[in-house]
Amino acid sequence: MERKRYSKRYCKYTEAKISFIDYKDLDMLKHTLSERYKIMPRRLTGNSKKWQERVEVAIKRARHMALIPYIVDRKKVVDSPFKQH
């Protein structure tokens, strides 16, 4: 069985020279969340270790402040949770 090779990805936070990730900025955080609001791993997002840890802390803070749900019911899963209706 062959391993799936992932393409080389670059950290978008490093390239954009972002100095701080705010937990209230959901547009920035949505790129590292799956459709079920789970935190995606570094190998899929391309984030560096430093920025992945900062994003995780920001997402956990946003969950604590009820800006992002902890869990999503299977029946309520949508394609993109951040689309405006």
From Swiss-Prot:
Query: GO BP, one example?
Result: translation
Similarity-based family: Belongs to the bacterial ribosomal protein bS18 family.
Note the NCBIfam families from the entry.
S18
Region forming the signal peptide: none
Please indicate if the UniProt record lists Ribonucleoprotein as a keyword.
Answer: yes
- The protein's name in its UniProt record: Small ribosomal subunit protein bS18
Functionally, this protein is described as follows:
Binds as a heterodimer with protein bS6 to the central domain of the 16S rRNA, where it helps stabilize the platform of the 30S subunit.
PANTHER family referenced in this protein's UniProt entry, alphabetically: 30S RIBOSOMAL PROTEIN S18, SMALL RIBOSOMAL SUBUNIT PROTEIN BS18M
* Subunit architecture: Part of the 30S ribosomal subunit. Forms a tight heterodimer with protein bS6.
Question: Which organism is this protein's natural source?
Answer: Helicobacter pylori (strain G27)
What sections of the protein cross the membrane? Answer: none
A Gene Ontology molecular function term for this protein is: structural constituent of ribosome
Gene designation? rpsR
Q: Which InterPro entries match?
A: Ribosomal_bS18, Ribosomal_bS18_CS, Ribosomal_bS18_sf
Q: Name one GO cellular component term.
A: cytosolic small ribosomal subunit
Q: Which UniProt keywords apply?
A: Ribonucleoprotein, Ribosomal protein, RNA-binding, rRNA-binding
